Regions:
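Bacterial extracytoplasmic/cell-wall-associated proteins, especially those involved in peptidoglycan
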Residues: 1-145
Length: 145
């Protein structure tokens, strides 16, 4: 739900659902991690100085943070608070996320897209993708395999 909120809170329901669709498509792909949380948090991490200085700590006890600007979803590693402030959008994101997870469905709005970006930017990576559709302020792409 946090991913839907931060990536598409200004979008209509279809735009928010499409972002969720991409997240689910990534979970189902062998090219990405196999859980929603790991898909959202995918990217470079660094270990906190608080745990790095203790070599005997287990991996579960270590604290990691995302490297700013080096993650799949920009809100995850932008250094800002992730606490939702726009409650109407947050509740809508929660409802959509619950529906998608509980029913294990997507509406197929993105026809299998596994990437997207805001329509006001033109990243280099989209040169190697197939443009599927535009929904709201986002363009959705499918990887060429």
């Amino acid at each position: 739900a946090l991913n839907l909120y931060h990536e598409a809170r200004s979008e209509r329901t279809a735009g928010m659902w499409a972002v969720g669709d991409v997240t689910i498509n990534r979970v189902k792909s062998i090219s990405f991690p196999n859980t929603i949380c790991n898909v959202v948090k995918q990217g470079r991490m660094y270990e906190s100085w608080k745990t790095k200085r203790y070599p005997d700590l287990s991996e579960e006890e270590r604290i990691y943070y995302p490297v700013k600007g080096k993650c799949q979803f920009s809100w995850w590693c932008d250094g800002k608070s992730d606490v939702p402030e726009e409650l109407d959008s947050w509740y809508r994101a929660l409802d959509i996320a619950r529906l998608m997870i509980d029913s294990d469905i997507g509406l197929g709005l993105t026809d299998g897209a596994d990437h997207y970006h805001a329509d006001y930017i033109d990243p280099d990576w989209n040169d190697h993708m197939i443009l599927i559709t535009t929904i709201g302020n986002h363009k959705f792409y499918k990887s060429i395999r």
